[in-house]
C-alpha cells in the first residue's frame, strides 16, 4: 500500500509570524491580514493547489522575555497585533469544499462553556 503525503499550510492572523525581515515573495499580501478577502483568496488558492488543510496559529500575549521587554516584539511586529483565528475560518470554509481547518485555541484563559459553544458553532 502506498502512503499519501498530506499538505497543510501554516499561517497566523497577523502581519508576520516569527520570521520578520526574511525574504518574501514580491506578490506577498500578508499586510492585508485584516481584510477578509485576503483569507478567502488564500483558502481558494490552497484548495486549487490540493492542500489538505490550513493551520492558523494564535498567541495569547506579547513576547516580552527578550531583554525583559515587549519593545522588540512591538517594533518588529512579531506576532503582534494578532487577531482571533476563529473569526476567519467560517468565511474560508464557505469558499472551499475540501480544505480542512485547524486553529490554536485555549481554555486556560476562558471558561469552557463559551469556548465549546464557539467551537461547536463553527
Spell out what each predicted region is:
Residues 1-96:
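N-terminal beta1-alpha1-beta2 module of alpha/beta enzyme domains
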Residues 30-39, 107-121:
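Glycine-rich anion/phosphate-binding loops
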Residues 57, 103-105:
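Short His-Asn-centered micro-motif
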Residues 84-88, 92, 103, 111-118:
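Generic hydrophobic, aliphatic-rich segments that mediate packing or membrane embedding
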Residues 96-102:
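Short, surface-exposed connector motifs at secondary-structure boundaries
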